[in-house]
């Protein structure tokens, strides 16, 4: 007598496949927004950290050289300005769009602006921040200077760094949660804080006063 043995199929049934796809869709629906938020928070942290490093370096250099050292938002054809090429393209942006990068220089002639290489000394150039980042100074003049004592050569400064959402809005709850502020006291010391405000209270630059 011949015995016929049945062999189980090695694949999935249609029902099993549909269930697996549905489960994958659920996982992705939670994972993608979380990953997107993680990336945006990393952008904010990276931008703030770079700014603080350069800010502290400028302050130290001012005390070392006993001259004013200025950091200003990059303007003009910024892509042709680097730390080794102090050309006419290395100019400050008086509109204060710090997300385009910034320039640090020794203000030898004391005019607050980056002059020719024979006059002022360029210390460094930071490239533009990641796409979607908005980094502005509350005063809007686009520069901050330290004197020979490491203190501010001017009034206190506040900087706001915001990460826009996919729709480009800047005042919803998520954007405020990702916002970071840098307050520079007259002593030259910088402090980072987070936004403490309800949705809708931020301006287009998300300048929100942190809670005391």
Predicted feature residues:
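Alpha-helix exit/C-cap motif
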Residues: 45, 53-79
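Short, acidic, Ser/Thr-enriched surface-loop or helix-capping motifs
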Residues: 8, 109, 185
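Type IV pilin-like appendage domain
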Residues: 69-145, 201, 212
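Juxtamembrane interface helices immediately C-terminal to a transmembrane segment
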Residues: 36-47, 63
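Cell-surface, membrane-associated systems
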Residues: 118, 137-212
